[in-house]
């Protein structure tokens, strides 16, 4: 039986960041996109992306969005830690009510990748089954679907208001 609103099965979304960014997030009262951080003159912020990724985001306009993921593990975190961009990773748990905000988009993979599909959240074809149900992870097809779903992004324009972040918002 199909859900009338498939997005209602999403319990939380996540945003990973360095623990050193938490104070700035608290002080600003919101989780801001990199474009908004630049506009506000915030320079002391550790991004997860490398310079190539930040440039690609700016060129494609993806820097205007806060990037969220579906699970509290993301393939990019390992590389960001290895390269020293993130020292102590914290996953911020985000209330899925953020999906109802105007302008929220869905990316069927890493959003700044050439040719990746980005659409309005209401038109998203999210593989919720592989994200939230028990499956046979030893099946190569299921494993490939899971790895692909881990890279998908929810894109929130400009900022995620603090009311969508858990009261004790660091997770992990």
Across the structure, where does each feature detected by a protein language model lie?
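Active-site-proximal loop/hinge segments that shape catalytic or ion-binding/gating pockets
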Residues: 1-172
């Amino acid at each position: 039986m199909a859900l009338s609103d498939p997005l209602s099965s999403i319990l939380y979304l996540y945003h990973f960041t360095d623990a050193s960014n938490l104070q700035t997030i608290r002080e600003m009262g919101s989780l801001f996109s990199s474009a908004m951080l630049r506009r506000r003159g915030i320079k002391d912020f550790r991004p997860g992306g490398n310079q190539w990724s930040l440039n690609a985001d700016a060129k494609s306009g993806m820097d205007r969005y806060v990037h969220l993921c579906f699970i509290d593990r993301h393939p990019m975190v390992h590389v960001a830690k290895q390269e020293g961009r993130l020292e102590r990773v914290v996953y911020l748990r985000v209330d899925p009510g953020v999906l109802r905000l105007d302008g929220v988009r869905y990316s069927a993979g890493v959003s700044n990748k050439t040719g990746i599909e980005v659409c309005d959240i209401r038109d998203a074809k999210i593989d919720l089954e592989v994200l939230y149900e028990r499956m046979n992870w030893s099946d190569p097809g299921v494993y490939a679907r899971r790895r692909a779903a881990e890279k998908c992004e929810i894109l929130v324009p400009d900022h995620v208001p603090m009311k969508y972040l858990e009261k004790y918002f660091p997770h992990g």
